[in-house]
Amino acid sequence: MRRAVCPGSFDPLHKGHVEVIARAANLFEEVVVAVSANPAKTYRFSVDERIAMIEATVSSLAGVAVRPMGPGLLAEFCRQIGADAIVKGLRGGADLEFEAPMAAMNRHLTGVETVYLPADARYTHVSSSLIKEVHGLGGDVAEFVPAAVLRGLDGGA
């Protein structure tokens, strides 16, 4: 079985994330969306809230599961669940520069490969941080987030 991990904080999930997860589901038998919980970071949504929003959004995608990932190494999480690959979306060259050293270390530690999927052009400018900022200032982000996330941002889970 070919299992891949799509890791991230997903705070919040946006349509760029969903598009990468859906493409990964077409490439692998199973995709685990690993929701990170780094105690050094401050999140808008709890892990449980993020998981619920992701599950509501990807429920129609065959072979996709959502799991929390603790503060440990991603490579170790992959080893524990038997993942063959890590899937990362890339919005541009800066993302690759950031991701490449981590991919090399993950491969060194456990042999897990990182597969990069270029972002859909509609979402190359979208990030979770930008979504939170624009929404917080009263901007309309409905075009960029799934319905479950928009409800969460508007105060109703």
UniProtKB/Swiss-Prot annotation:
Required cofactor names: Mg(2+)
TM spans (from-to): none
Swiss-Prot/TrEMBL site (Transition state stabilizer) positions: 17
GO cellular component terms, A-Z: cytoplasm
Record has Transferase as a keyword: yes
Pathway it works in: Cofactor biosynthesis; coenzyme A biosynthesis; CoA from (R)-pantothenate: step 4/5
Reactions the enzyme catalyzes: (R)-4'-phosphopantetheine + ATP + H(+) = 3'-dephospho-CoA + diphosphate
Binding site residues for substrate: 9, 41, 74, 88
GO molecular function terms listed in the Swiss-Prot or TrEMBL record: ATP binding; pantetheine-phosphate adenylyltransferase activity
Class of enzymatic activity (EC top level): transferase
Matches recorded under InterPro entries: Cyt_trans-like (IPR004821), PPAT (IPR001980), Rossmann-like_a/b/a_fold (IPR014729)
Pfam families (UniProt xref): CTP_transf_like
Entry keyword set: ATP-binding, Coenzyme A biosynthesis, Cytoplasm, Magnesium, Nucleotide-binding, Nucleotidyltransferase, Transferase
Binding-site list for ATP: 9-10, 17, 89-91, 99, 123-129
The enzyme's E.C. designation: 2.7.7.3
GO-annotated biological processes: coenzyme A biosynthetic process
Places the protein is found: Cytoplasm
PANTHER family, per the entry: PHOSPHOPANTETHEINE ADENYLYLTRANSFERASE (PTHR21342:SF1)
Family (UniProt): Belongs to the bacterial CoaD family.
Protein function: Reversibly transfers an adenylyl group from ATP to 4'-phosphopantetheine, yielding dephospho-CoA (dPCoA) and pyrophosphate.
Protein name, entry field: Phosphopantetheine adenylyltransferase
Biological source species: Micrococcus luteus (strain ATCC 4698 / DSM 20030 / JCM 1464 / CCM 169 / CCUG 5858 / IAM 1056 / NBRC 3333 / NCIMB 9278 / NCTC 2665 / VKM Ac-2230)
